[in-house]
A protein has these predicted regions:
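Single conserved hydrophobic/aromatic residue that forms the stacking wall/gate
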Residues: 455-465
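Phosphate-binding site recognition
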Residues: 1-454
Length: 465
């Protein structure tokens, strides 16, 4: 029997199923989505936890003309009545916004236009459909205005595009549309970083408002992202809108790998002897009521072990991003926060109020907001909830502890490079009898001293269960 391959970086469900890759069955997501039906559902999970692959699987299941054999032998195939009713029954609009970025709004809008235009182009048969009127065919053609190889939209046409496409698909098929939007919050993140946040909020609010709120041709929609952006920001007025976060028990096994799934993949590739290392380095996340491993880490490390049985665990997840959020957090830390970071690195937990609804321009306005974002994006995890609703936070595993220590080391290196300036400030503060400045500088000195010991911590992070 052919040995299946490890799907490193492959996010297309059909490719995995057709090309001999190992697949951890997450088709319970389909069943739970239909049984817990909402008009619009948003799943928030950290990056590299299988969101895009999950969305690709949903498209393969619901899309008219799908190859039903892709689901042979998978969990969902056991629910015959559900498959008969829903598999291959809907027109599906699927867009991923993970590449929508630019140094300016105009650059980002052009990328966004290309993504929308490419999806519309997949339904080019609508231009000749005998189910559409002459006017409707012209409306479709009006969505595909191309100049010099680029899709051209004015803002009004852009924001109406998904709703109009839904209407035309409904007219052609006689069936309402499923809309899937992957990584919905990436354009907002990039816009905030590059100074055009409010323009992007306005654009996405208009697009989502028409596609998800006032769309009579929508069966249901599913969105994924890392953060839950405040409903008042871009989801204004959406009814029957459900957000499923890492705090919720529903769908808690649908993204990321469970302990059982990790043991199965290790057994399949004869790597079971490495279970303890994988658990120490890549386990520790708690979604709802389930312990979860980072799938990106597990697959990458298994791939390394298959090539070299002596390979050591690496920081795969943390090295897939710049992790500027952690450095920003350390830069802004006050004395209390620095003490809390020390406790986290020592394997303890801290208790914090978590806000699950923020806007990007609120994230770094306070340390409290940064705690919330570190939790939501996977740098911290939940150990429990207090009676008054505060969340017990801890560093999930060895990999993330290494990341915090690395960022503290960078901060320490940068600040000690300015020791001469700091000493001068300290002396001036004494001469000026500026007690507040003296306290701040002395606190920073203590943090530097403590940092020297923190960056040499090497014992494994304790799992607090």
């Amino acid at each position: 029997m052919e040995i299946l391959k490890l799907p490193v970086g492959i996010e297309n469900f059909e490719d995995i199923r057709r090309s001999g890759f190992y697949y951890i069955d997450k088709t319970m997501l389909i069943e739970q989505t239909l049984n817990n039906w909402s008009k619009v559902t948003l799943f928030t999970r950290p990056r590299r936890f299988g969101k895009t692959l999950g969305m690709s699987m949903l498209r393969s299941f619901f899309e008219i003309g799908t190859d039903k054999s892709l689901f042979d032998g998978l969990y969902i195939s056991q629910n015959k009545s559900l498959c008969d009713e829903h598999m291959g029954k809907y027109p599906v609009i699927f867009i991923s916004l993970k590449d929508v970025e630019g140094l300016s709004y105009d650059e980002a809008f052009q990328v966004f236009s290309r993504i929308i235009g490419n999806e519309i182009s997949k339904f080019s048969f609508l231009a000749e459909s005998d189910k559409l009127t002459v006017l409707e065919k012209e409306q479709f053609k009006g969505l595909l205005h191309i100049e010099k190889g680029k899709f051209i939209f004015d803002k009004d046409t852009f924001t109406a595009s998904l709703k109009l496409l839904s209407q035309l698909l409904y007219k052609h098929y006689g069936q309402k549309v499923v809309i899937l939007i992957d990584e919905y919050d990436v354009p907002l993140d990039k816009a905030y970083q590059n100074g055009y946040y409010h323009e992007m909020v306005s654009l996405i609010r208009g697009l989502f408002g028409q596609a998800l709120k006032t769309n009579d041709y929508l069966q249901f929609a599913i969105l994924t992202g890392c953060l839950r952006i405040s409903k008042e920001s871009i989801f204004t007025g959406l009814n029957n809108f459900e957000v499923v976060s890492i705090m919720d028990s529903m769908y808690d096994e649908c993204f990321g790998f469970t302990d059982k799934e990790v043991q199965e993949i290790l057994k399949y590739f004869n790597l079971s002897e490495h279970y303890a290392d994988i658990r120490e380095w890549y386990d520790g996340y708690h979604f709802g009521n389930t312990d979860i491993y980072c799938p990106w880490d597990v697959i990458r490390y298994c791939k390394s072990l298959c090539a070299d049985p002596t390979a050591k665990p690496q920081d795969f997840w943390s090295n897939s991003s710049g992790n500027a959020l952690v450095r920003s957090f350390i830069d802004k830390a006050d004395v209390q926060t620095k003490d809390e970071i020390e406790r986290l690195i020592a394997g303890e937990y801290i208790e914090k109020e978590i806000s699950q609804e923020l806007t990007y321009d609120e994230i770094d306005k306070s340390i409290a907001n940064l705690w919330s974002v570190l939790f939501t994006t996977g740098y911290l995890t939940k150990q429990g909830v207090t009676d008054d609703g505060r969340v017990r936070l801890s560093i999930p595993n060895r990999e993330i502890k290494n990341l915090f220590i690395k960022k503290i080391r960078e901060w320490f290196s940068d600040t000690t490079a300015n020791d001469g300036k700091t000493l001068e400030q300290f002396c001036n503060a004494f001469l000026d009898k500026d007690t507040e400045k003296i306290e701040q500088l002395f606190g920073d000195y203590l943090w530097n001293t403590i940092s020297l010991s923190l960056i040499h911590i090497s014992e494994p992070t304790r799992h607090l269960r």
